[in-house]
Curated annotation (Swiss-Prot):
Heterohexadecamer of 8 large and 8 small subunits. The basic functional RuBisCO is composed of a large chain homodimer in a 'head-to-tail' conformation. In form I RuBisCO this homodimer is arranged in a barrel-like tetramer with the small subunits forming a tetrameric 'cap' on each end of the 'barrel'. It is found in: Plastid, Chloroplast. Its main location: plastid. The gene is RBCS2. RuBisCO catalyzes two reactions: the carboxylation of D-ribulose 1,5-bisphosphate, the primary event in carbon dioxide fixation, as well as the oxidative fragmentation of the pentose substrate. Both reactions occur simultaneously and in competition at the same active site. Although the small subunit is not catalytic it is essential for maximal activity. Keywords: Calvin cycle, Carbon dioxide fixation, Chloroplast, Photorespiration, Photosynthesis, Plastid, Transit peptide. Residues 1-57 form a transit peptide. InterPro entries: RuBisCO_ssu, RuBisCO_ssu_dom, RuBisCO_ssu_N, RuBisCO_ssu_sf. It comes from Solanum tuberosum. GO terms for molecular function: ribulose-bisphosphate carboxylase activity. GO terms for cellular component: chloroplast. This is Ribulose bisphosphate carboxylase small subunit, chloroplastic 2. One of its GO terms (biological process) is reductive pentose-phosphate cycle. Belongs to the RuBisCO small chain family.
Length: 181
């Protein structure tokens, strides 16, 4: 087999361009701190560190006495029928199956049978009828809420949106609370 070797030599030459317009000053590092004005606080009071300038007002936290927290949206006032209708329409628009549950004694989570941190009683409620598979009308769901309310006037009623593909509960909110809660 024949092989060939090709050699080429390149010669680099340096030319000094001494035009004043193309000269760039060399990088000499960061500027010294002496060129910047320095203003230091002389007040060593620790309370002055946490000041937000009065621009933000503090928010009130949830009062723990006689104000039970239930489900999603429980920090808001009770939902009106129009607001419930919009929530159920949102639930149906996402393709979730509406389901009604009710609880006659405790409408909130509590600890009675076990004291470990991850365990709560009151998470599981009684289902009202069967889940409403195939339901496309939000007024039909609210009619079931009214029927449940007539049967159990002293019960908490919640609406759940269940995703039957992923098999998870996607939304849950209180639709009715008894008087005094």
């Amino acid at each position: 087999m024949a092989s060939s070797v090709i050699s080429s030599a390149a010669v680099a030459t340096r030319t000094n361009v001494t035009q004043a317009g193309s000269m760039i000053a060399p990088f000499t590092g960061l500027k010294s701190a002496a060129t910047f004005p320095v203003s230091r606080k002389q007040n060593l009071d620790i309370t002055s560190i946490a000041s937000n300038g009065g621009r933000v007002r503090c928010m009130q936290v949830w009062p723990p006495i006689n104000m039970k927290k239930y489900e999603t949206l429980s920090y808001l006032p009770d939902l009106t029928d129009e607001q419930l209708l919009k929530e159920v329409e949102y639930l149906l628009k996402n393709g979730w199956v509406p389901c009604l549950e009710f609880e006659t004694e405790h409408g909130f989570v509590y600890r009675e049978n076990h004291k470990s941190p991850g365990y709560y009683d009151g998470r599981y409620w009684t289902m009202w009828k069967l889940p409403m598979f195939g339901c496309t009308d939000a007024t039909q769901v609210l009619a079931e809420v009214q029927e449940c309310k007539k049967s159990y006037p002293q019960a908490w009623i919640r609406i759940i949106g269940f995703d039957n593909v992923r098999q998870v509960q996607c939304i849950s909110f209180i639709a009715y609370k008894p008087e005094g809660y």
